């Protein structure tokens, strides 16, 4: 009957179900433990101050709680009973499920004990491992349960609320409360529960002895035996890797350690009397300072076992063994595991390289992959838990914490992931190999062994025969799960003591069957095998440690290329999920995505930072060749040659940072790396990391590291540009000179272009996108661009200082010069000479020039608007002057009217109307001259960069008349060519005067020109108006008036479309020349003649001549008809003579 019962109780099926359910229940317990420790997600009733008295009473009296006799204490509980039961029901019924699961587990263990099953991991592998896993699951589940701090409060509060609602306690509460009390000391209670079952545990652990002793060796033993090497026996390289205990070869040492320690501790009074088991137990204690309970919950081995043994009645003699093991582990364990990791790094690298080159070897040698992955995983999870727990348990002054730091761990992780990728990539190769192997070999040898087997019942014979037939006719659609379960059932049936067929007497059949089951897993369970041997989802529960690992990896150039292994590990996190705890899915998925995102982002930031440092070095080299740097060296050399002293020392100090090009390439020792060498090495390593994987898949999301890099480079590029603009000082008053800015920009672009050789990223597109955005007003993030910043500075600082008289525009030098009236914080020519403007154009591009031009012209239009307001005030007087320009008296009256000082003295710096008109005219001239200089720089750059485009444009432009040139004014401005009419000014004036009647506006425009013409003679009244031929400028910038007049006149009269620009300009010339001649006449009739007055009058003649010379609609012949040219010649002669003196 015992044999019949063994089949009827379905031991195999129950072991599968209960192990899975135990894993699910531990997931739920773990989730409850973490939730109760987090105030954000903790049930609010446990933190409610009104509930505090009831909870204290419950915990003190647990599990016997009388709610009715303590009605005052439980008054609030009764009031909130419905909410309490609803909120705590998940917690309570989870504990109830644990009670139910424990009962089922104990029932199965007792049943197997009563059937007197014979367990041997080398024969009935599935049955033995499932049994031991179930025992360990029971132990760890109870340990984890005992660590939930609020378990009594949760259960007691729920039961009290339930009792107050229904008048009786919840049905399972008495047994549940007793379980909580029993497992306050879980090891002690488990010793009582599992002690009677020690025979079966002894049988299982005894069979593990040989496997454990063979597997748990030092790295030196592994090296001697070439344990993971495919090339150790070249003649056997194409043969399938086979052993008699094939499934034990990749069995996790971490799992075996848990079997030995937990089972040996719980049943110490019997199991440890066996020398073999005691030796294994001691060895496990010597190799581990802590063991995994579940996820990041650990079991401090020596401390916990010592406390348990001391509390036992018999005062076990094993206490000294534990103390000796702890001393041994403290000295040797860390070093042994570190040596293993060193060996595994080289072994996995060799294995990975060989299999990548010859993926066909994955068929016969897949066992080596599982063995290597399993060993690597064991070492990684050992290191993780010890790095967290050892600092808390080690003695002060111990070096264990320092020895646990493994800077080369990322390399080990990288090769583990490489092997996983190879298995995934060549899934079909492995599957096809084992489909043929199973049908051509396994089915034959299994059939032969079945035929030779004696003592099989009909049902057992049918099961094995069907198994052999199925694998003989196997194909990719065969359901192999049923075959593996049949073999599991067979193990359970034939392991019972009274079974007629004893598997131990037919070892050959067991070996062939176990081998065949392993081969079947290679066909349809490769993903499960990967999870079993190399799942590192444990990293999910050590987020701070993981972050520390990948940050340290980035800081070490030799390991930097492996940093994305930590991003790829995030894909493992979802394997920690269980169907019995669905509420964890969102949280763990979010953690996986966050880690992957953080690793890639931080790696890209590090790469960008290194690029910045390399670019700084490149800029330093480029700056050495600039004239300013060369001048410093030359001056220093001259000063040092002339003598010694403070001056020579200061010169030497100034030149110390400068070195001749080529010096950076000198080497004294090839082992000595310079900082640029180190930066370049790190750059290449991180580039290799980011370029190794085009995409990373994590939790149904796809991450593209190169896309991250492109975005990071773009962001860093913008930050660097802004940092360079203000020379690293965000609150600086003056930006970097355009030439230096361009030099720095070219240095960074050179570095970026060099990066393209290290990683396949579209650097050109990144640079084009970024630089193109920097030519606009704002970038894609709505922040100011370099073009906007330069435009703002030139308008609000440079040109504003110029309009205040602090600068002079030199026509000869084509730049702004300091007038010397006030000390400036910058040299104007450092920002406005042709070389600087050409550099500026290259930085901001045509779009930036267009932006700056529009802003400049907007200011011009604003000045014209202000002048129009003055004209409107004196409209009648100007009408009279326009019609009586040949009447000297009336013209003089109008000029005097415009020259009257304002009566309102409250306004500071108030001037007369004439001076206001002239001042605004000069400002307009300055802006227009600067704008033309900017266009000249643009034209020069276009000619050098796009000669064919420029030639085509010139050919078109020179064959157009003025009307057509005006029509393509915007295009010509983009090429740096100034047309007959400034169309941007026309549009700006039209935009600022939308509601004025056209005829009225036309009249105002005519009167504005009249007003300027009448006021021009006042220029000669200032000593600062003297013209200096050496710089072709006046100190008050009055030489800018001709440009202003021509620009205003052409724009205003083109706006009205009456085709009278030439007539209006002749009218202006007549008014201006008559006014100047009248002034000459008044000067000649005056008795007092001053040289200063004469010099200032010469400026008027030059202004008149330059206005005509630069005007498209006037000629010298027209000037000659209304103004004697000999005055102009005399004026130039006098100015040159005065400047020479």
From Swiss-Prot:
Q: Which domain of life is it from?
A: Eukaryota
GO terms, biological process = actin filament organization; cell migration; cell morphogenesis; cell projection assembly; collateral sprouting; cortical actin cytoskeleton organization; egg-laying behavior; embryonic body morphogenesis
Compartments where found: Cytoplasm
What Pfam families does the record point to? Nckap1 (PF09735)
Q: Which GO terms describe its cellular component?
A: cell junction; SCAR complex
Family matches, as InterPro entries: Nck-associated_protein-1
The record's account of tissue expression is: Expressed in neurons.
Q: Which UniProt keywords apply?
A: Cytoplasm, Developmental protein
Chief place where the protein resides = cytoplasm
Gene deletion effect: Embryonic lethality with cells differentiating, but failing to become organized. External hypodermal cells fail to spread over and enclose the embryo, but instead cluster on the dorsal side. RNAi-mediated knockdown results in reduced egg laying and in defective endocytosis by oocytes characterized by an accumulation of aggregated yolk protein in the pseudocoelomatic space. RNAi-mediated knockdown results in abherrent inx-3-positive gap junction formation along the adjoining membranes of EA and EP endodermal precursor cells at the 16-24 cell stage of embryogenesis.
Oligomer status and interactors: Interacts with aco-1, gei-13 and gex-2. Interacts with gex-3.
User: Family per UniProt?
Assistant: Belongs to the HEM-1/HEM-2 family.
Q: What does this protein do?
A: Rac effector required for tissue morphogenesis, cell migrations and egg laying. May play a role in egg laying and in yolk protein clatherin-mediated endocytosis by oocytes during oogenesis. Plays a role in the formation of gap junctions between EA and EP endodermal precursor cells in embryos.
Name-wise, this protein is Membrane-associated protein gex-3
